[in-house]
């Protein structure tokens, strides 16, 4: 049986067709929230040192800016003195990757990581669970830790210092906004003949093209 007559042919499935990558992202994220059992907003963040040594880790997307935002992008929060924060300070070019296995979809983003405003970091920090806020103060993220008891002791010390809910945000805890220059949508298809649609920023607009799988 030829592929053209196969009921599972990738060419019998509607292909990706979007005009607005942010609108498409929002729709795919909504689909993922209904399909993924855990953390549909989880994304791989890739950074690189000034000498080009890459590193990657999973972080959580916290917001996507509305169209009127002057630096519209994808926002996450972290310790800015961690490895990723140090690398972003030296080289703000980063990549993000969302993968939703249940949907057979990926979105890949390239762009520049820009620190969020202090007010934005403050606002989000105070929505976090109390122990998470204490942990942010207690952890020297990415630095050597002698043992778990040391971390436990530091958290307990912060808890004693701030017994109530008024826990100040440490200056090194903030966020970044990734302003994209490239957004690629990938849809799994049979026989590895996947569908890829990439948007590239062209001034205030977006150009788009298909890519071979």
Swiss-Prot record:
Enumerate the cofactors the protein uses: FMN
Reaction(s) this enzyme catalyzes, per UniProt: pyridoxamine 5'-phosphate + O2 + H2O = pyridoxal 5'-phosphate + H2O2 + NH4(+); pyridoxine 5'-phosphate + O2 = pyridoxal 5'-phosphate + H2O2
Instruction: Give residues annotated as binding FMN.
Output: 57-62, 77-78, 83-84, 106, 141-142, 186, 196
Q: Which InterPro entries match?
A: Pyridox_Oxase, Pyridox_Oxase_CS, Pyridox_Oxase_N, Pyridoxamine_oxidase_dimer_C, Split_barrel_FMN-bd
Q: Does the keyword Nucleotide-binding apply?
A: no
What segments bear the compositional bias annotation Basic and acidic residues?
Answer: 145-163
Q: Any keyword Flavoprotein? A: yes
What is the species of this protein?
A: Granulibacter bethesdensis (strain ATCC BAA-1260 / CGDNIH1)
Function of the molecule = Catalyzes the oxidation of either pyridoxine 5'-phosphate (PNP) or pyridoxamine 5'-phosphate (PMP) into pyridoxal 5'-phosphate (PLP).
Q: What is this protein called?
A: Pyridoxine/pyridoxamine 5'-phosphate oxidase
**Family as reported in the entry's similarity comment:** Belongs to the pyridoxamine 5'-phosphate oxidase family.
Q: Which GO terms describe its molecular function?
A: FMN binding; pyridoxamine phosphate oxidase activity
Question: Which branch of life, at top level?
Answer: Bacteria
- Complex formation: Homodimer.
Q: Which gene encodes it?
A: pdxH
């Amino acid at each position: 049986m030829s592929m053209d007559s196969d009921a599972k042919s990738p060419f019998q499935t509607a292909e990706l067709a979007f005009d607005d990558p942010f609108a498409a992202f929002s729709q795919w994220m909504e689909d993922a929230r209904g399909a993924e059992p855990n953390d549909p907003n989880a994304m791989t963040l890739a950074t690189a040192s000034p000498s080009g040594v890459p590193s990657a880790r999973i972080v959580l997307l916290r917001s996507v800016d509305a169209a009127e935002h002057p630096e519209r992008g994808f926002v996450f929060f972290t310790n800015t003195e961690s490895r990723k924060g140090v690398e972003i300070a030296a080289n703000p070019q980063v990549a993000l990757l969302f993968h939703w296995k249940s949907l057979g979809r990926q979105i890949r983003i390239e762009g520049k990581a820009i620190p969020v405003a202090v007010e934005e970091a403050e606002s989000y920090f105070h929505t976090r669970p109390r122990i998470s806020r204490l942990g942010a103060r207690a952890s020297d993220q990415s630095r050597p830790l002698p043992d778990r008891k040391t971390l436990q002791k530091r958290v307990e010390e912060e808890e004693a210092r701030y017994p109530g809910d008024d826990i100040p945000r440490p200056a090194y805890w903030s966020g970044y906004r990734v302003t994209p220059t490239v957004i690629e949508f990938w849809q799994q298809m049979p026989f590895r003949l996947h569908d890829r649609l990439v948007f590239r920023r062209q001034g205030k607009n977006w150009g788009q093209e298909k890519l071979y799988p």
